[in-house]
């Protein structure tokens, strides 16, 4: 018997932004799906608009599992995780142990199919970069939503994320920011105005 998917189903019980007051709580499971949506879009934009040649479906799949190890480690707040290089390195080691532990929960005959997904050392640099971009974009979108709801708790977080996005800049991210991000600051009525009848 394998408890792999029983563990993954508990990602919905791990709240993100645990040290911040949230208008709407976000869990790791829903965050992972949004990162998969955005990473997939970034990959398609890269391929269609900017001469890229990445596998958008694989990137979406990797993004779905990108925080899976948090079902074992929990969600460590970013300011803590990256407080200094030593903590970041040690936390990366803990993540590797958690990835290995998750992989070992699978039946032996399935482990080699899941290893390239769960073990982030088997992801290409380009795949990792796109997923990190999507992860940062989704955190930024969460901040926009909270700020739009009047929650000023996210003022510093959005400033930090704007710097992160600038550091992870790419043409596909610029396109996504220009075309898709503005809608996240609008109400349902405002985004529904453009829906064709």
Curated annotation (Swiss-Prot):
The keyword Hydrolase applies. It comes from the Bacteria. Its cofactor is a divalent metal cation. Its EC number is 3.1.3.89. Gene3D superfamilies: Hypothetical protein af1432 (1.10.3210.10). GO terms for molecular function: 5'-deoxynucleotidase activity; metal ion binding; nucleotide binding. Substrate binds at residues 16-17, 31, 67, 75-78, 135. It holds the Pfam family YfbR-like. InterPro entries: HD/PDEase_dom, HD_domain, YfbR, YfbR/HDDC2. It is found in: Cytoplasm. Keywords: Cytoplasm, Hydrolase, Metal-binding, Nucleotide-binding. The record marks 16 as: Appears to be important in orienting the phosphate for catalysis. It catalyses: a 2'-deoxyribonucleoside 5'-phosphate + H2O = a 2'-deoxyribonucleoside + phosphate. A divalent metal cation binds at residues 31, 66-67, 135. Residues 28-140 form the HD domain. PANTHER family: 5'-DEOXYNUCLEOTIDASE HDDC2 (PTHR11845:SF13). Homodimer. Belongs to the 5DNU family. Catalyzes the strictly specific dephosphorylation of 2'-deoxyribonucleoside 5'-monophosphates. This is 5'-deoxynucleotidase plu3092. It comes from Photorhabdus laumondii subsp. laumondii (strain DSM 15139 / CIP 105565 / TT01) (Photorhabdus luminescens subsp. laumondii).
């Amino acid at each position: 018997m394998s408890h792999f998917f029983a563990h993954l189903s508990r990602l919905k019980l791990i709240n993100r932004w645990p040290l911040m007051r949230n208008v709407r709580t976000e869990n790791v499971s829903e965050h992972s799906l949004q990162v998969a949506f955005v990473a997939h879009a970034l990959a398609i934009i890269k391929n269609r608009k900017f001469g890229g040649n990445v596998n958008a479906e694989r990137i979406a799949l990797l993004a779905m599992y990108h925080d899976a190890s948090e079902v074992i480690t929990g969600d460590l707040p970013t300011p803590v995780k990256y407080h200094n290089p030593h903590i970041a390195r040690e936390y990366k080691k803990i993540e590797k142990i958690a990835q290995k532990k998750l992989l070992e929960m699978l039946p032996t005959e399935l482990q080699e199919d899941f290893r390239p997904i769960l073990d982030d050392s088997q992801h290409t640099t380009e795949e990792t970069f796109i997923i990190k971009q999507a992860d940062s974009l989704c955190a930024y979108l969460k901040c926009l939503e909270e700020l739009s709801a009047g929650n000023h708790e996210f003022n510093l977080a959005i400033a930090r994320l704007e710097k992160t996005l600038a550091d992870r800049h790419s043409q596909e991210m610029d396109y996504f920011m220009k075309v898709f991000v503005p809608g996240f600051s609008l109400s349902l009525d405002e985004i529904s105005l453009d829906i064709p009848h």
